[in-house]
Amino acid sequence: TQYSAEYLENLGLIKMDFLGLRNLGIIAEIMDDINPKFDINKIPLNDKKTFELISNVNLLGVFQLESNGMQNLARRMRPNSFEELSMMIALFRPGPMENIPSFLENRAHREKIKYLTKELEPILKETYGIIVYQEQIMSIARKLANFSYGKADVLRRAMSKKKAKELEKLKPEFIDGCLKNGYDIALANELYELILRFANYGFNKSHSIAYGLVAYRMAYLKANYPLYFYKALLNGTIGASEKTYAYIKEIRSRNIGLLGLSINKSTNEYQIVDDKILLPLSICRDVGSANVSKIMEAKPFSSYVDAICKLTEKGVDIKALTSLIAGGAFDEFGLSRYSMALNLSRVIQYANSTNGLN
């Protein structure tokens, strides 16, 4: 029998979300290409080239940072530390997002930052007077309204689950706590309204740091190992033609070499050959993974006719062979694509008669 998450949570059971992240696979592939002993945990978190890449908005393919909105924020903010990168990721959410102009203004003119009360300064100083993290809400509730750690966490969970009724229920207790601490009711109400607006979609700090770390690592690898970065990125998007086109367009703009299809060298994945990226057979329309496996089994090929004979014997159909010719997979044999396509049926007939004799 299965129960939905909220009932299990009410019973006191621990609920964990395990989410797959293909970017971790991309990072692992890049590390292995650089050096099997390369340790991503030892890269510096203050790499100049990485922050230049982020500030210059060269963010295509970088986790959490490649959307138009995030690129616009990166252009305006130009983060210069890992902590600021994590803040940027936390800010770009429906709750904190409305405070982005104030955040940028305060960051540029820190001497002008004003706090509703001096007790907020140690809580909000790191984020330039703006509420960015759920933990800051908890600290405000504890410091100003005398909430216990447990009660502050109830408030945090109500925010993260967007439970409007529960948030409204906690309001009198928050106001009362503020009044008992000597704050006036206007300030207490203003603080709680801030909390409610933030509740739209606030991140906890650990979440932002974790996302920031993956984003930073991908930006670091793109800045310092672009060839390996693009190769792994393309392998992660095989079958997604729109993304593949965008990545290849950027690769060409950066003067990174691309090698066309080779029936002998290409496989089912992008590879690095002579400091260039070799295209895979799998990008050819109508070829498919099953045919790629057959091609891999039939290699090597000494000529166009030899290739067609072996592939016909393996069961690669004429549609796939036509696509491979059009894609340039047989160009290495020195024949024109036109002549190869024109004579394909005859070569297949020859292959069938030869294979029958064998």
Predicted segments with their positions:
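Noncatalytic, beta-rich nucleic-acid-contacting surfaces in large DNA/RNA-processing enzymes
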Residues: 1-358
